[in-house]
Amino acid sequence: MTKYIFVTGGVVSSIGKGIVAASLGRLLKNRGLKVTIQKFDPYINIDPGTMSPYQHGEVYVTDDGAETDLDLGHYERFIDINLNKYSNVTTGKIYSEVLKKERRGEYLGATVQVIPHVTDALKEKIKRAATTTDSDVIITEVGGTVGDIESLPFLEALRQMKADVGSDNVMYIHTTLLPYLKAAGEMKTKPTQHSVKELRGLGIQPNMLVIRTEQPAGQSIKNKLAQFCDVAPEAVIESLDVDHIYQIPLNMQAQNMDQIVCDHLKLETPAADMTEWSAMVDKVMNLEKKVKIALVGKYVELPDAYLSVVEALKHSGYVNDVAIDLKWVNAAEVTEDNIKELVGDADGIIVPGGFGQRGSEGKIEAIRYARENDVPMLGVCLGMQLTCVEFARNVLNLHGANSAELDPKTPFPIIDIMRDQIDIEDMGGTLRLGLYPCKLKSGSRAAAAYNNQEVVQRRHRHRYEFNTKFREQFEAAGFVFSGVSPDNRLMEVVELPEKKFFVAAQYHPELQSRPNHAEELYTAFVTAAVENMK
C-alpha cells in the first residue's frame, strides 16, 4: 500500500516547505524506500511556463517536458530522482481538465462543483503520481499558506485522502515560522498555534510540526507547541537556519524525523545510511579555495531565476574542491566600454538562458570579451544562440546578424524559429520541451566533458534554433558544431576548440545536476575556470 505524506505551511510563505519535503524524501530513500514527490500550486496559471521570472523564479523542466515550479529542482537534486508531469499540479490545470470533461459530457449532466469534482481531480493527481512511478511513498507539498482562499480545494482533497486510504497510510506535516522578538527576548508560539487552529478547522490534524527558526527553540517551547497543537513532543522538529541547504537532511535525521514518520506510517525499514551525504556536506563546509564566475543575465535582481544554474555551478565546484564566488552581472547594463570592468576579474563567464531583446546585446558583449580574451565561457540556451550571433558579427563580419526572435528584420537570421513552431500561436506549453538526445562529435571538448559518450540525453526549453544555412560558413572559420540531434537537423552544442574553454549548449545541462553527481559540461567549465584562476 502506498503511503501519503502531505506537507503544508502556515504563518508566512517561502518558509522552506520544499526543502523540508525534499530532505524527508532523501531520508526515506536512504532507508530503501522508493519515493516520489509533487508540488500543488494554487495559482490559476496552467503552469509557470509563461510567468515572469520576477514573479516565479526559474521554470524547471522535467524529462517529459512539463514546465514546473522551481521546487521540483530541489526535489530532484535532494532525492536524486527524475520527476514527471504529475509532479506539479496547479489550480489552472485542474480547472482546465474539469471543464474539458464537462464539455465532453463525462459528468453525465451533473452540476460540476468544487466538491466532489475538483477535489476528486486533485486526488487523482496524487494517486497518479504514485502509480506512474510505482512508489512506496509519495510526498505532496501544498504551496502557499493555510488560510489562503486559493488553497481550500487542495486542503479539502488532502483531508479526504485520510478517509480514502486509511489513517495508517496518511501523515500530515505542518511547517510554520517560530519568530523571535528581540524586544521581548523570547520566541512566540502564537502564530503557530493559530495556524494549526486554522488547519484543524479545515478538518486536518497535523501529525508533525516543523518549526522554522533562527535559533534553537528548546524543549520547553516544543512541549508548549505539542500541548496546544496536539502533537507528540518528539514530533515537533526544528528547522534551523543553516549555511548550506544540504545540511538540512542531516539535521532532520538527528531529530529522528524519518523514524517518527516511518513509525506513524507503519513502515519497517533499516535506518537511513547518510554516510555519503554527510561526507559531501563536510566537504562543502570546508572548501577553502574560491573560483570567481561572472553570471551575465537578464534577471540577476532575482537569483531564483537562475537557481538550477547556481546549484549546478556549486556542484561542479565540489568536484574541483572550490567554492563558487558568483559575480552577478546585469546584462542590460553591459556595454563595450564597461565589459572589462564588469567581468575582467572573473575566472570564467557563464551566459544562461532567457527570452526577449532586453539584455541580449550585453550578453553578446560578454561572449565577445570571453572569446577575444580567452576566458573560459559556458553558454546555455539563449547563451548558445547569442554565441553564434557574436561569432557571425565579429568573426564572419555579417553585420546586423541576429536571432529572428530578437530582430525579425535581421539580414542574417543566424537563429531562426524551428520549422514545427512556425504556425503555433499559443505561448504556453508549446516550446521544444523535455529530454532529447544529442550526438557528440568525437574528439571535441563536449565529448571529452561527457567521458567520450557518443550520445547524451539532456532537457530542452526553446523555440528557436541555429539556422543551418550558415553552417558551412561557420565551420570554414573554425566554429565547431560538436553536438547535433541524431538527424543532424538541430545544432545542440558549439565550441571553439583552440580556446581554453568556449562551449555553448542549446539544452539546459543544469537541470540534471545533482550535489553527489555534478553535470559534466558544467564540471568541465568550472575545471577550466579553476585552471584560469587569477
From Swiss-Prot:
One of its GO terms (molecular function) is glutaminase activity. Pathway: Pyrimidine metabolism; CTP biosynthesis via de novo pathway; CTP from UDP: step 2/2. GO terms for biological process: 'de novo' CTP biosynthetic process; pyrimidine nucleobase biosynthetic process. Its EC number is 6.3.4.2. UTP binds at residues 13, 188-193, 224. The keyword S-adenosyl-L-methionine does not apply. L-glutamine binds at residues 54, 354, 382-385, 405, 463. Residues 292-534 form the Glutamine amidotransferase type-1 domain. It catalyses: UTP + L-glutamine + ATP + H2O = CTP + L-glutamate + ADP + phosphate + 2 H(+); L-glutamine + H2O = L-glutamate + NH4(+); UTP + NH4(+) + ATP = CTP + ADP + phosphate + 2 H(+). SUPFAM superfamilies: Class I glutamine amidotransferase-like, P-loop containing nucleoside triphosphate hydrolases. Mg(2+) binds at residues 71, 141. CDD domains: CTPS_N (cd03113), GATase1_CTP_Synthase (cd01746). Residues 1-267 are annotated as: Amidoligase domain. It is an enzyme of class 6 (ligase). GO terms for cellular component: cytosol. It comes from the Bacteria. CTPSs have evolved a hybrid strategy for distinguishing between UTP and CTP. The overlapping regions of the product feedback inhibitory and substrate sites recognize a common feature in both compounds, the triphosphate moiety. To differentiate isosteric substrate and product pyrimidine rings, an additional pocket far from the expected kinase/ligase catalytic site, specifically recognizes the cytosine and ribose portions of the product inhibitor. Belongs to the CTP synthase family. NCBIfam families: PRK05380.1, PyrG. Catalyzes the ATP-dependent amination of UTP to CTP with either L-glutamine or ammonia as the source of nitrogen. Regulates intracellular CTP levels through interactions with the four ribonucleotide triphosphates. This is CTP synthase. The gene is pyrG.
